[in-house]
């Protein structure tokens, strides 16, 4: 199949549509689709991927639009792994968040095709709370928090902070083995090294990350993208409710917070739209305070339409 043609229904009982037909043409790649646009064969490109983005932005006859994808980048932290008990410390998780340069991840490795994420509900959703705390990149503040927690640099001049018992502040970060996620993981590793935290990287195929690490809770930290249902209802219950922390459920961080779970439970059953929004707001406030995992970015979807197309 190389395309689909939709024609106007002349028997439609209301006003006749103004457009006589719409033609969808299929191409083997985004580059081929862009060439077709340049040749005047099509009036738009359904997806402007990163490889053709520079050319698309430079094309004067192509208007570029973006929208958020229901896909969120996170560093998941395993809060119930006895190998890394320090991840249970809220202030330490906050220090890790402060030490993350999320904008660099977006600019350097995603060509700007994402926006920073500050919580577990997509920006733009009716359930998103705009007033949620937005934690900046502040390495100095991160270091101050670590010092407050008793993590200091060793007297011999080492670069990794240790606690009062001399144990290093170190953990592993498992990540997908594709080029983009590998570069992101290396950038995160460098960010945290700058505040005295040692991160050992583990590169695996995404299927292995899901099945061998997340599902089995056999990890310390993981760089992931959480895919949400393509519906107007955000329902963060599967990823963050305490009942989903074990078995094959998806609360991979094993976050066990009863007040947050109660808000999610109530939001699932009430039909009062305003009440649901307030319940999700309260949930997001707790999430921002506790930071059971570290939100990074929301991917965006980019497409292009000929400037002559109206409406």
Predicted features along the sequence, with ranges:
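Ligand-site clamp/hinge motif
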Residues: 9-55, 189, 196-200
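Detector for C-terminal structural segments
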Residues: 66-68, 72-73, 99-133, 138-141, ...
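Short helices/loops that flank or line small-molecule/ion binding pockets
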Residues: 31-41, 58-59, 91, 186-195, ...
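A ligand-binding cleft/hinge motif common to bilobed small-molecule-binding domains
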Residues: 48-59, 228-233
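Bilobed "Venus flytrap"/periplasmic-binding protein-like clamshell domains
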Residues: 1-13, 28, 103, 139-143, ...
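Immediate post-signal peptide segment of exported/extracytoplasmic ligand-binding proteins
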Residues: 16-20, 90, 136-172
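Short, well-ordered beta-strand elements
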Residues: 3-5, 20-26, 44, 168-177, ...
């Amino acid at each position: 199949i190389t395309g689909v043609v939709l024609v106007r229904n002349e028997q439609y009982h209301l006003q006749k549509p103004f457009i006589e037909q719409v033609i969808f043409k299929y191409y083997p790649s985004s580059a081929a689709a862009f060439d077709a646009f340049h040749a005047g064969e099509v009036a738009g490109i359904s997806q402007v991927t990163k490889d053709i983005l520079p050319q698309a932005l430079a094309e004067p006859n192509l208007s570029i639009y973006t929208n958020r994808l229901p896909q969120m980048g996170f560093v998941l932290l395993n809060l119930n792994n006895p190998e890394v008990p320090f991840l249970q410390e809220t202030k330490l998780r906050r220090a890790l968040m402060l030490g993350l340069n999320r904008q660099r991840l977006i600019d350097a490795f995603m060509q700007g095709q994402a926006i920073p994420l500050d919580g577990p509900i997509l920006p733009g959703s009716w359930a998103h709370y705009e007033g949620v705390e937005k934690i900046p990149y502040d390495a100095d503040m991160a270091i101050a928090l670590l010092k407050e927690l008793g993590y200091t640099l060793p007297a011999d001049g080492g670069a990794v902070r240790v606690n009062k018992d001399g144990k290093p502040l170190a953990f592993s970060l498992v990540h997908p083995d594709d080029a983009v996620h590998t570069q992101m993981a290396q950038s995160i590793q460098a960010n945290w090294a700058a505040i005295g935290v040692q991160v050992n990287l583990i590169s695996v195929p995404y299927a292995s990350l899901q099945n061998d690490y997340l599902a089995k809770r056999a990890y310390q930290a993981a760089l992931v993208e959480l895919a949400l249902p393509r519906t107007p209802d955000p329902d963060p219950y599967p990823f963050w409710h305490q009942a989903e922390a074990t078995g094959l459920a998806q609360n991979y961080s094993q976050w066990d917070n009863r007040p947050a779970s109660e808000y999610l439970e109530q939001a699932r059953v009430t039909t009062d739209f305003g009440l649901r929004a307030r319940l999700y707001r309260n949930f997001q406030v707790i999430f921002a305070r506790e930071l059971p995992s570290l939100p990074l970015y929301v991917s965006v979807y980019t497409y292009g339409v000929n400037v002559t197309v109206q409406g």
